[in-house]
Amino acid sequence: MIENLRNIAIIAHVDHGKTTLVDCLLQQSGTLDRKSQGAERIMDSNDQERERGITILAKNTAIKWNDYRINIVDTPGHADFGGEVERVLSMVDSVLLIVDAVDGPMPQTRFVTSKAFERGLNPIVVVNKIDRPGARPDWVIDQVFDLFDSLGATDEQLDFPIMYASALNGIAGEDPDSMSDDMEPLFQMIVDHVSAPEVNSDGPFQMQISALDYNSYVGVIGVGRITRGKLSPNTQVSVVDRDSSSRNGKILQVMGYHGLERIEVETAEAGDIVCVTGIDALNISDTLCDPAAAEPLPPLSVDEPTVSMTFQVNDSPFAGLEGKFVTSRNIKERLDRELIHNVALRVEQGDSPDKFVVSGRGELHLSVLIESMRREGFELGVSRPEVIQKEIDGQLCEPYEQLVIDCESEHQGGVMEELGQRRAEMKNMVQDASGRVRLEFIVPARGLIGFRSMFMTLTSGSGIMTHVFDHYGPVSKAELAQRNNGVLVSMVKGKTLAYALYSLQDRGRLFIEANVEVYEGQIMGLHSRSNDLVVNPTKAKQLTNVRASGTDEALILTPPVLHTLEQALEFIDSDELVEVTPDSIRLRKKLLLEHERKRASR
């Protein structure tokens, strides 16, 4: 049985098609029955994953092919969710690296691949989207080889097998010019090149928890790979945590995977990936073992967070009108619940009881959490993201990121000038025949805060940017570019009127339309100059009986700029907050009253 088991993780850059490939493998192996074949990207089960088109949580699935059972784990491509990636690699024996046939390997591919090499895993390279116009498989393979070499791969890792595929059409082959009609060659390659798990199924039971799930019916569900022995339901075990203290527990159910379903099994043996229930207060990296032989496995390590934000109770005049959960106790309980399964997150008490400093791997990591809370009915105020500085050998250091930009060559000058002001250092520049250019930079992480929205404007929306944590380096003394413009701030509480907004739109770009309730201290728009301007958006036209009716001109308002959550977080300055409620995202000053702001600025 164990010889026919294969555990493999899938690595790919965002949008290179790994989730589509898994769907294709599930369907062609006959693991999925007809009823669930309709949905696309079956693996991305969470709402936000479908909307953003990214994978956030690592997922497991099992495929039966001929007599083999292949456990496949889908990993997130974003470095922001690197906490997920590192744990997943502890469960597998090889990785499937998926690369786009046009783009080649991108920085996030680099991040996950380096983690795989650290664990000594041998990759299989799949060049996907081979049917795209402009596919250049030979160039991509050279790039992959250079990438592996620069990451210090061994000779064995550099001698990687290559498969060409188009997941959308469901075909694969070892030669891009002669593809087979289905995914058979890929299944065969996985079976031939991935070794069966090297485990001892006769010794005392031992497994490490590498992911957690929660179900209100059975409580906490631990997911992990059995490293030794066998496991059946209703077994007594010892739970050893990362501080080596142990306690006893009893496993109630043991579940294996079949396709995307979890099915209860009577017995599971070493090498298989299973879920267990019945043990309270499980943590990631706990070891479950036979009480007679309680040996903990080494704890899993996760990279440190690099970005922090303050979450606070919403104290605006509109607090509590839209959300269900508004108190600091609600927010604290929700953050504590998130900490159980979101390993890369840290939460500390802020400088007052209703503030919490939440640190994560990047802006995306935290904005996904805020968006989830918003949908659950929470209201909160969120401050601008800040980078976390560390002291290394007596010197203050800050995180630096590797940034890769793909844009039209006509936009190159503007992008480079903007990055120059943000203290970016250019490492490489490659032009391709189609008039696009790829730029690589090393840039301080705080220089990237707020850059994405700027970048989209500079490249008219046609640029692609990706970045990943590179290293901690000395803090750069120079000032980084900040937002140049001030904002328009409301001086009164009330309903906005078209008459007032019409005269304000010459002063800058508005964020709010007519007939919307606003409050004093709320940000109405971006001022065209560098100072903040206090305005009255509720001013009505003075009516007199002198004028004849019908002489008023029609007021034409420019449509307002509406921010998404990420854009709002990037836009605000250090004295501003984003007010997040289930129905709206508002920008506001930390101090709502003008005389308080004046006093604070002295």
Predicted regions mapped to residue ranges:
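Structural and coupling elements of P-loop NTPases
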Residues: M1-R602
